[in-house]
Every structure is written in structure tokens, then in C-alpha cells.
Amino acid sequence: SDSKIGDGCFGLPLDHIGSVSGLGCNRPVQNRPKQIPGGS
């Protein structure tokens, strides 16, 4: 149920990128650096 905490949006852990709750859903984070200074 808590896919947001473990998988984020496309299956990557939040810890790996820092935060996929925002840019993770919109674009591949593996190609984009973490632009979010938090997680919102």
C-alpha cells in the first residue's frame, strides 16, 4: 500500500534519488538530478 515510500513513482526508492514524489512522476530521475530540496 505504501508504494510512495518504497517505490516512489516508477519503482525507485526515495533514498536513492532523495525524492521521487515530485520529479519522479513527471520525468526519469536517472537522467535528471534531484531538483527538490526536500520531498514535497
Swiss-Prot record:
A Pfam family matched in the record: ANP
Keyword Flavoprotein on entry: no
PROSITE patterns assigned to the protein according to its UniProt record, in alphabetical order: NATRIURETIC_PEPTIDE (PS00263)
Similarity comment text for this entry: Belongs to the natriuretic peptide family.
Source species of the chain: Pseudechis australis (Mulga snake)
Tissues of expression: Expressed by the venom gland.
Stated name of the protein: Natriuretic peptide PaNP-b
Propeptide stretches in the record: 36-40
GO CC annotation, single: extracellular region
GO molecular function: hormone activity; toxin activity
Primary role: Snake venom natriuretic peptide that targets both NPR1 and NPR2. Exhibits hypotensive and vasodepressor activities.
Coiled-coil region list: none
Presence of keyword Secreted: yes
SS bonds (residue pairs): C9-C25
Subcellular location: Secreted
Domain of life: Eukaryota
Primary localization: secreted
Keyword tags: Disulfide bond, Hypotensive agent, Secreted, Toxin, Vasoactive, Vasodilator
Alphabetical list of InterPro entries matching this protein: Natr_peptide, Natr_peptide_CS
Gene Ontology BP term (one): regulation of blood pressure
